[in-house]
Amino acid sequence: MSLPTPSVQLYTLVEEFRADAARSLDRLAAIGLRHVEAFDFVGRPAEIRAALDASGLTAPTGHAPLLSDELWTPDGSIPTPEPEAVLEAAAIIGLTTVIDPFVEPVRWSTVDGVNEIADRLNAVADLAATYGLSVGYHNHAQEFLIDIDGRSALEHVVARTDERVAIELDLFWALTGGQDVPALVRRLGSRLLAVHVKDGFVPAENPFGVDADRTVTRHLDQRRPGEGEVPLVEAMRATDAVRWAVIEYDQSPGDVFDDIAASYAFLLEKGLAA
């Protein structure tokens, strides 16, 4: 059984990375990491690639919007770049898979909306192939608002999309969406390219419901792995398909680099990554 390779989503240290990308990457390398997951890279791909090369790190995966004309953030909606611009930047950095990190809950709340998401994923997979890239989707909790034909909307998208479309399962948000996370991991099977390794105590109500108050996502109770209620060990041992174990904190509970180091140590000590 091959083990996933550790990585870290750069959103975890978004402020530190924006302030000093080179120093941030050097600190990740000092922890022992060799890979990162890129974030907010479209506007400065050459700069990010240079910083990665200097630190000896690579970014095999990255987050960027591919399925939306504008993107929600805690500070308001922002316009998204054209898919071609995203893919060109990804190729410069050296990504192999570009993962869409968020599609608005309202689009996940109807069968037509979910089908449209799947169809756009198929179309962008075709486009990405012309750049030598693949695409994927990363969940929050809105992907579990409705069931279609007896399965979650996320799984409906998996069934409706080409095998080239990968899934990156955020284990914390899947639990927030009411899922039996290890069972979901098993059902996703070979489509599961990566997981976001994230622990904590999930909100009492899904903050990504159509009419939910999303400001609660500014105050999440996230913890180091093994200190929350997410069944990380069971979920990660439920499959051997996962290629990347991506450390992430939406809000780090302490010093961000210490927390990343603790997550990295957890993965190695539990035999969940190598």
Where are these regions (language model features)?
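Acidic-and-aromatic substrate-binding clefts and catalytic sites of carbohydrate-active enzymes
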Residues: V14-A19, H35-I48, L66-P81, P105-S109, ...
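C-terminal helical cap(s) of enzyme catalytic domains, especially alpha/beta-barrels
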Residues: D255-A274
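Alpha-helix-loop-beta-strand connector modules within alpha/beta enzyme cores
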Residues: R49-S68, L121-A128, E155-D162, V230-A235
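Active-site acidic/histidine proton-transfer and metal-coordination neighborhood
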Residues: H35, P74-A166, R187, F257
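Acidic/histidine-rich catalytic cores of soluble enzymes
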Residues: T130-E229
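Hydrophobic faces of well-ordered beta-strands that scaffold small-molecule active sites
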Residues: P4-L10, V36-A38, A59-A64, V98-D100, ...
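Short amphipathic alpha-helices and their capping/turn segments at secondary-structure boundaries
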Residues: P45-D53, E84-I92, N122-A125, D180-L193, ...
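N-terminal pre-domain/capping segments
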Residues: M1-I93, L268-A274
